From Swiss-Prot:
Biological source species: Lama glama (Llama)
Glycan-bearing residues: 102, 141
One of the GO BP terms on file: cytokine-mediated signaling pathway
Gene that encodes it: IL1A
Record protein name field: Interleukin-1 alpha
The entry's keywords: Acetylation, Cytokine, Cytoplasm, Glycoprotein, Inflammatory response, Mitogen, Nucleus, Phosphoprotein, Pyrogen, Secreted
Entry function: Cytokine constitutively present intracellularly in nearly all resting non-hematopoietic cells that plays an important role in inflammation and bridges the innate and adaptive immune systems. After binding to its receptor IL1R1 together with its accessory protein IL1RAP, forms the high affinity interleukin-1 receptor complex. Signaling involves the recruitment of adapter molecules such as MYD88, IRAK1 or IRAK4. In turn, mediates the activation of NF-kappa-B and the three MAPK pathways p38, p42/p44 and JNK pathways.
List of residues that carry N6-acetyllysine: 82
Pfam families (alphabetical): IL1 (PF00340), IL1_propep (PF02394)
Length: 268
């Protein structure tokens, strides 16, 4: 079975030494376009024979071979048509090789399994408090209070709003978000509302101080959205979930009805 790295090593050896093949490849930036036209002398006949011997039937679908050089596409007359630089030292299959030959767009191959947190490393920087000691009322005019254990939040109809939880809303900013991320901290404490999975109660997480930069603790952040007279708090960590209330249920995370995600902010 033909070894793909050996093929490209043979192709590279066919260049004359004065063409500075290696230095051109080494100085490419991964941020630059990955395809470009280049003119070279025709390859020797024996090199073309080796190229023509490669076919998809000779390349394993599951072979875990890695390229440390750029992938090269060569025409029948020996002219280099395309070079592609890989964005990471990734495993290559013949599906990737076929994509290189057929792809008309100029792009860098990205690994299929790169986690989101590796692709987008967002930092949120603290700005200021935008609401002091505000009260959150849901669409049924129930106010947010602490449950009897003090560990969770719940909604209840109150005759005296002094019993409602007062929140300080801290605004953050980042280079990648056009929305306004905020934290909800219980006033005069270091307890921050922390989003959980769908239908799970939100937690009150104690922090030593107001975070100046939030990078990993995105459960503490919510995109504050306003539609008409209603306010919504969408989780940054779980973008499809909102802070919500429901009859006989603790304040939790939900995507919508039957839970209530509409709130009004009452300022003191």
């Amino acid at each position: 079975m033909a070894k793909v790295p050996d093929l490209f090593e043979d192709l590279k050896n066919c260049y004359s030494e004065n063409e500075e093949y290696g230095s051109e490849i080494d100085h490419l930036s991964l941020n630059q376009k990955s395809f470009y036209d280049a003119s070279h002398e025709p390859l020797h006949e024996d090199c073309m024979d080796k190229l023509m011997s490669l076919s998809t039937s000779e390349t394993s679908k599951t072979s875990k071979l890695t390229f440390k050089e750029s992938v090269v596409m060569v025409a029948s007359n020996g002219k280099i048509l395309k070079k592609r630089r890989l964005s990471l030292n990734q495993f290559i299959t013949d599906d990737d090789l076929e994509a290189i030959a057929n792809d008309t767009e100029e792009e860098i191959i990205k690994p299929r399994s790169v986690p989101y947190n590796l692709q987008s490393n967002v930092k949120y920087n603290y700005m200021r408090i935008v609401n002091h000691q505000c009260i959150l009322n849901d669409a049924l005019n129930r106010s947010i209070i602490r449950d009897p254990s003090g560990q969770y939040l719940m909604a209840a109809v109150l005759n005296n709003l002094d019993n409602a939880v007062k929140f300080d809303m801290g605004a953050y900013t980042s280079e990648e978000d056009s929305q306004l991320p905020v934290t909800l901290r219980i006033s005069k404490t270091q307890l921050f509302v922390s989003a959980q999975n769908e239908d799970e109660p939100v937690l009150l997480k104690e922090m030593p101080e107001t975070p100046k930069i939030i990078k990993d603790e995105t459960n503490l952040l919510f995109f504050w959205e306003k539609h008409g007279s209603m306010d919504y708090f969408k989780s940054v960590a779980h973008p499809k979930l909102f802070i919500a209330t429901k009859q006989e249920k603790l304040v939790h995370m939900a995507s919508g009805p039957p839970s209530i995600t509409d709130f009004q902010i009452l300022e003191k």
